[in-house]
């Protein structure tokens, strides 16, 4: 099943991947699994994190991939969108199907003044 995001955009680095806007992630949080792939210090640091995210540091993703719930679409998040694009592409290549990258990461999330936790 593929989630029907209103504003999904082709990812500029991975042709098999779509980006979704921070606003749409916030609006649909309850219907999504949010995975933040930053380091612990970034997750709890200045930019904070979106409510409801699960932290899986990118370097640990290969061994933790099978722990990610697949009953909802999965959106990967990082600081600016680079690491989360890598994570989403890796997840797709390894069997997850309804996978997205959050455009602009937590930098854009903060620029848009969306709520964060620390």
Placement of each model-derived feature along the sequence:
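Rhodanese-like catalytic fold shared by cysteine-dependent sulfurtransferases
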Residues: 1-33, 40-73, 82-118
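Short, surface-exposed ligand- or partner-binding patches at beta-edge/loop junctions that are enriched
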Residues: 77-78
